[in-house]
């Protein structure tokens, strides 16, 4: 994993944020969606270039998992380690291993979202605010590896910081006191293009 970390650091330092975002899209297209399924047979037949029994077994387990059986060999791994595997194009990991890591990362992200939304609804019901939600989203973003941050809008961090400083009350400052907290959270979590339009307007 240390070699993957070194390769990731070199890649991140040599590319701009925009280039890194494009690289992420390119790599993800090979392990998800049509790009993955178009090469499904080859992906399932892929074997890592190693004689290490543990690594060979891990690759086999990953193929079994992405085909609906067995346990994800990367279950419980940290998000940083998962990212190293997902975006590693050196051949150290098979396509199915990278897909399995991507699935685990997706599951962890989904669990985080469920928790932060539940906490934020409680915050909204009690105070009318979403300041803690914006803070949690910002902290989550800052913890992401550079290649994952690059997939977010350029204005994401700045706008969240602005909303945190504003400490807005969505109940008392909306029509008839019925502001939709869920709508605001959905826009932030789904990276709504109008909300993060990078032109300085505040759309939350």
Model-derived segments and spans:
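Type III/flagellar secretion export determinants
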Residues: 1-204
